[in-house]
Amino acid sequence: VLGLFTLGNALIHFIISIVVYKKELADKNIFYFISGLVLVFITIAIPVQLDGNWVTMFWALQAALLFWIGRTKKVLVYEYLSYPLMVLAFISIIQDWNSANNFYSPEFANNTILPIFNIHFLTSIIFVGAFAFINYVKRSPNYSQPEKLNKDIAQIFSFLIPAVLIGVTYYAFFNEIQVYWNQIYI
């Protein structure tokens, strides 16, 4: 119920943002602010309404979408909104891996998964795809870094995005191989 209320709130803000945009009732910054609120309410509704891996997938995809909009349309607020979502998605995937490793432990020997075709690996691959897309857009000469972007934040994320991408890619395959062999020998 709470998730539906939050989505309803996002829908109301979405309708208002469309009216503001179509009728040109306010400055573009107001439109971007209201649209940002829509995204914030959707971001809040995701963990309230969904569980585990779905939250990670939606947050990673939403971060990629916001980063792409922010960089290609030169709307700095969307790029700034993407950075906390990247952090949330990273924390969420670590929690997903932790719960997956606990689920497939020797105490639960009857629990088996199909290698590669399981929700945990799918989540990891979607996360890697989203971060690869973010990294591509960030490094693309077609989409230059906005002038007003905080240089410290830009420098930190210029290092973190590829590092997270490499680390998650490695651990996704490592975890999949480990779970497979644990199922056979434990």
Where on the chain are the PLM-derived regions?
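Alpha-helical transmembrane segments of multi-pass membrane proteins
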Residues: 1-186
